[in-house]
Design a protein with these regions (language model features):
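Intrinsically disordered, low-complexity terminal regions
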Residues: 1-251
């Protein structure tokens, strides 16, 4: 019986010892409905939701990449920098700068959950992170590298640049958009009554649309589209190298 008890205690202690260190950062800051939010991060996730309050709630969960001493050291040096003015908030993930002792190990992961006024403007820069934005009714700018972007129930002007990533969007209405993609894909769902002017240029890629459009092939690897949908309206521009554009309609 004793060996079994000792083994159980040792196993429990080992499980506790190998848990990856975590910490959280949380703040609530006044932000008017016409304010702006800028977020810059690397390695993690961003979850943006909206409400009608004149404030922004920020929650960041930080987790070490592993349990090795170099991973833990990097985790200890990782912080979230939050600055604000009367109508703007800046959020930036801060990782340890390069020194001889930070050569080994991996940076910590930071997962953001943020709720802000639905009409606040957003600018997001991310590398190797997933981005989910829901309910924003204002301008959104996103630059992503090696990431995934999903937009749902958004209704503001959009500007998205993606390198080696995918972008999906379900738009409540359309007020203009520009997408630039390299080795990525864009799958966009719009109301069937949406009126817009599509300008698409895809090299070594493809363009597919539920909306009636004349798709022109300039050679085997160059696809262009320039046409109006439902009488025309705000511009939808898509520029891609080795990327795919898919436009779907919804009732």
């Amino acid at each position: 019986m004793k060996p079994m008890i000792l083994f159980s205690v040792w196993l429990a202690a080992t499980s506790t010892a190998i848990a990856q260190p975590t910490k959280t950062v949380g703040r609530t800051i006044p932000l008017p409905a016409t304010g702006s939010v800028t977020l810059e991060t690397h390695n993690g996730s961003i979850d943006v939701q909206t409400w009608d309050r004149a404030e922004i709630e920020i929650h960041a969960g930080i987790q070490a990449a592993g349990t090795w001493s170099d991973d833990v050291r990097r985790f200890d040096q990782t912080t979230v920098d939050i600055q604000s003015t009367a109508d703007s908030v800046w959020i930036k993930s801060r990782y340890p700068t390069f020194t001889t002792w930070t050569w080994f190990g991996s940076n910590a992961r930071i997962d953001y959950k943020i709720t802000a006024p639905k009409t606040a403007r957003w600018t997001i820069y991310d590398h190797n992170a997933s981005v989910d934005v829901r309910g924003v009714q204002a301008a959104i700018t996103i630059e992503t590298h090696n990431g995934r972007v999903h937009l749902s129930d958004v209704a503001g002007p959009l500007r998205v640049g993606a390198h080696n990533g995918s972008v999906t969007g379900d738009l409540a209405s359309f007020r203009g958009a520009e997408f630039t993609s390299h080795l990525g894909s864009l799958d966009l769902t719009l109301p069937s009554t949406a009126a817009f002017h599509l300008q698409a240029d895809s090299r070594r890629g493809s363009v597919q649309s539920d909306f009636p459009l004349a798709i022109r092939m300039l050679g085997r690897r160059h696809t262009t589209v320039d046409g109006e949908v439902n009488g025309g309206g705000p511009s939808l521009r898509f520029h891609s190298h080795a990327g795919k554009l898919r436009l779907q309609s919804k009732n």
